[in-house]
Amino acid sequence: MRIAVFGAGAWGTALALAFSARHDVVLWGRDAGHIDTLAATRHNERYLPGVPFPEELALTADFAAAARAADLHLVVTPLAGLRAAVGELNTLQPDTPLIWACKGLEAGTGKLPHEIVAEELGPAARCGVLTGPSFAAEVARAMPTAVTLAATDPAFARRWVPALHQPRLRIYANSDLVGAEIGGAIKNVLAIAAGVSDGMGFGLNARAALITRGLAEIARLAEALGGRPETLMGLAGMGDLILTCTGDLSRNRRVGLALAQGKTLAEILGELGHVAEGVSTAREVVKLAARHDVEMPLCEAVDTLLHDARLGPREVVEQLLSREPRRE
């Protein structure tokens, strides 16, 4: 089988490496110079240093050529690039099955990835999302990982879970696209909160409380949007949240750690050199929650910290801790 992976960042490269063990894979990148470097060195030193490419992995900067030769399209761009990529794929190869592996809410619209895809491809498109607790560096090194392939059409999952599943990249099927995507989006916002908490030295009790109460926020919003609570108890919810809030490979957690040190958001993003989806997602989560009358105090606190220069981490934390007690 031929798979085209669109996006030569850390996660796109990691998935291309993983799937090349069983399939013919071509990795597409927008920057032709970057792709030339990958082809010459057979490494992605910018995003995944120290991980060599197998001989079988093909590389290209020709979007159309990659799309037309594939049996499966896998879009692994930042969320901001999903709409354009899917729209172009629809023009080139409208009937090719599609999986995306980006998380968040679209800036300006607040739409989940599957809503973006439906607008570009139509509601009957054969598609799904690959999500769950997975650091690219570990997947690229074939360290054991488990993720979810969520698709509303059970036949899609039956076709692609066995095709992509591997002993060290275990893939589980789920039919709850909303729950899976809400879990993947909001965990990035909560990881910023966890980084702030740890960076301020609040300890393990505080981190456990933050993760637990954060999971409750995710579940409330997912249910309001039609998602299933049990999805949030699985890989796409609890699993992804725990990993992102506790693992120092998490870019969003590192944003929170740096905020706790007093750095400005502009300084942090400049030093990071990668996209931290939680930064843009925080504002959209708060707006989405307000539209559905869902209380999300932790996400609101992160949004305030990111976008209100008048308040620093300590002031935002004090506001949270001064909230009235209530039923769990």
From Swiss-Prot:
GO molecular function: glycerol-3-phosphate dehydrogenase [NAD(P)+] activity; NAD binding
Cellular localisation: Cytoplasm
Keywords noted in UniProt: Cytoplasm, Lipid biosynthesis, Lipid metabolism, NAD, NADP, Nucleotide-binding, Oxidoreductase, Phospholipid biosynthesis, Phospholipid metabolism
Active-site residues, as the UniProt record annotates them: 187 (proton acceptor)
PROSITE patterns on file: NAD_G3PDH
EC numbers on record: 1.1.1.94
Chain residues that bind NADPH: 11, 30, 103, 136, 251, 275, 277
Subcellular location, principal: cytoplasm
Residues the record lists as binding sn-glycerol 3-phosphate: 103, 132, 134, 187, 240, 250-252
Cellular component terms per the entry's GO annotation: cytosol
Keyword Nucleotide-binding carried by entry: yes
Coiled-coil features, chain-numbered ranges: none
Enzyme class: oxidoreductase
Biological process per Gene Ontology, one example term: glycerophospholipid metabolic process
Reaction catalyzed: sn-glycerol 3-phosphate + NAD(+) = dihydroxyacetone phosphate + NADH + H(+); sn-glycerol 3-phosphate + NADP(+) = dihydroxyacetone phosphate + NADPH + H(+)
Pathway membership: Membrane lipid metabolism; glycerophospholipid metabolism
NCBIfam families in the record: PRK00094.1-2, PRK00094.1-4
Protein family (similarity comment): Belongs to the NAD-dependent glycerol-3-phosphate dehydrogenase family.
PANTHER family: GLYCEROL-3-PHOSPHATE DEHYDROGENASE, GLYCEROL-3-PHOSPHATE DEHYDROGENASE [NAD(+)] 2, CHLOROPLASTIC
Role according to the record: Catalyzes the reduction of the glycolytic intermediate dihydroxyacetone phosphate (DHAP) to sn-glycerol 3-phosphate (G3P), the key precursor for phospholipid synthesis.
Protein's UniProt name: Glycerol-3-phosphate dehydrogenase [NAD(P)+]
